[in-house]
Swiss-Prot record:
Optimum temperature is 20-37 degrees Celsius. The keyword Transit peptide does not apply. This is Depolymerase, capsule K63-specific. Optimum pH is 4-7. It comes from Klebsiella phage KP36.
Amino acid sequence: MALYREGKAAMAADGTVTGTGTKWQSSLSLIRPGATIMFLSSPIQMAVVNKVVSDTEIKAITTNGAVVASSDYAILLSDSLTVDGLAQDVAETLRYYQSQETVIADAVEFFKNFDFDSLQDLANQINADSESAQSSAAAAAASENAAKTSENNAKSSEVAAENARDQVQQIINDAGDASTLVVLANPDGFRHIGRCKDIATLRTIEPVESRQVIEVLSYYNGLAQGGGTFWYDPNDSVTEDNGGSCIVTNGGKRWKRIIDGAVDVLSFGAKPDDISFDSAPHIQAALDNHDAVSLYGRSYYIGSPIYMPSRTVFDGMGGKLTSIAPSTAGFMAGSIFAPGNYHPDFWEEVPKVAATTTLGSANITLADPNIVNVGDIIRLSSTTGVLSAGFFVSEYLQMARVLSKTGNVITIDGPVESQLTLVAANANQPGYLARFNKPLFCCVDSIIQNIEIDTWDYWTADSATYNVKFSNIWGSAKAVAYGNTFCRSLFEDIRIVFSGRVSELAFGSHDTNLVRITAIASPKGLSASVVFGWAESGRRCTIDTFSIMLNANANPSTVIRVSGHRDSLIKNGSIYVHNNTNNILSVENYGTTADGVRPDCDNITFENVSIFVTGSSAVVCDVYKSADNSVIKNVAFKNIKYFGPTPSVALYRARGTLANFVKGVQANISSDTGGAIVLSNSENNVLTFTGPVSVTSLVSAAAKNTLSIRNYARSSAKANNFTQESTLNVTDTTANAVSKEFTYPAGSLRINDKIKLSLGGSTAGTVGKKTVQVGFIGSDGAFKYVELAALATDQVYWTMEVEISFLRTTNSQTNELETSAIITSFLSKGAATGAALSGSRALAVVSDLALSNFVVQVRAWKENAADGLSLSRMNLQLEDLTA
């Protein structure tokens, strides 16, 4: 690879490159648009030549707005390695010497570089002719009589030089494959350029020039991946060999990798698609040494968790990490990530200092202010708490960034929210070891995104994060969003087939949000009896837009339980349950016991949650105070909709003690199949139920609570309410085959009504397409529908949430009012690699509801009888909240 590096160069933000001591327009510079200019600054900056304006000015592009002070530089004349580029270089060189006949000696020096015996003879001839020309010129000066002779001799020398030049070109042409220029000009000429074969060999090559550049073919010899371009940094004698971006030679010299963008884990020796190779140490090395790392869409196998450093972006770009740790290796051995390394058990031995705080203030007085610096994360914890499974869990915990420090007083980025006695410690404790003998640390300001994961274990577990984002993670693992002490962090677009739990935000997790979460239970069942549990000193956590899908093999006793959290919100979700033996949504507090003090449950809200049960359920919504000192305040169940068989115990249940009533609950719960309302030691609650519910001791309940029950019986319209009792296996192979039809008689529907249909099932086989359609008959007789279309290769679990509503529209031609129906659906197709989510809609005019029947149909068929298509769940309900 040819280089031009004469003089020095600087670059402005607009891409103007200014040279000092440069001759960029010189004919022999060979600098053309498209060449790469590399500034040997720190860090290295690169740009592309757009136009050579003058000997000292170049216009560059793709500069990323970088500003570079005057420094050493190199222009990579890489185009010389292509056929066209090499031809252009040779042509420019020959044209130059044709125009410089008075400096033949320079031409001689140029062609001396070609290693041919005959060329040496020609060079000697040129030298002799040049000397003859000089002698003739001297003779002319000495004698007027000899002038003509000298002139003739000079002309002969000129002609001889031209002949020599032409002979050199002929030698090049005649040399064929023996010519270096011809060899390099071949389509595969680049292979003849000397390059280092692998990283191991690079360690044996000692650089001889400052900022020398070398090309490495591959990380491992023969694999053709992980190579790159390195440069010699003569000013560095201390950086350790990190196995990827800094390679130290046997003589102690540093080769530095030239990196553009996120570091590829290939550059640190990771091997894609090799199940026999543990890439974890190599990925870890890349993350430990760079703040932007990527899998670049490739798949790797790891034998241990990846410990995520702070202030780092790890972007899989669609790549995959699969654990190869044996399932017998123990808790967290098969985890994919460890963003932080925390557990209360490891914190007990860490020294802490007294912290004087004021409720609502961000100023803290520390007994020893030297434990933190500005920018550090401080860990505040109460001296009171509870023993949980043998280790101490503080009643209050807060992670905060230190914004300022004056003497013993620090200011943090949020107010203290407790009046308890607090102690403080730096959140990072490199001198103390946690799980797997790794330092106890908190991951700060990092991003993990666009990665598929596959493990039998939790994909993240013994964590501690502050301002960390997990985005677009999918695959299979023991849990969906699980771990310790997630603070000011975000999980978004997480889609996991799980075998244990959906979520546990434990040990003081606070200000953490879960958004667009899809949790699909493993077909093999679940290991946990509570799949979603928020407990142990958490606060201000939210899950928004979620779907929990539990199959017939996944029957936990409790789906969602909140205990020991406050200011938490669970909203905009769908829960699909086969059988449930305890409760689906619950808030529970167990008070102070001999084990210690548990945090209060305060301000817990469930909002816009739809629950679909195909088998049986016990309690849908539950509030429970187990002890006289249990604290539960400000609980709300807003717009909770239940679809399924009548719960065996209660649609809503509230239980306190004689000395500690359940108070302050607000509930708005609907169930078209009804259910019991069980109130035990409960008062001063505002409760609204819709459906054929029953209330034990109605008079007593109404006397102690604000109670409203809405059950508008319209038998003709509700006669179609339907719950499928068993799986329907579709056998039809005829297109548009009707599996189920619901006819609403004329006059039974109103303009404000909504028909909701929830379906679920599965597809199998890979021969033909499988189709499920839900729709209605329009006034033109056409079927208007939304559709599940499973490809031949799809073998999935699927759900359809369909809603049909009515509205009055104006005919654009007649300007008359007419009735239209709109059907919308939310479709989820889940498989072992995640879930695909989509929505669809159809709108059509229908006949007058007062005069004509309204027909809803479910159509299902498959192209090939050998394939499988089942409807395991079908619930149709008329939403009827008008008088």
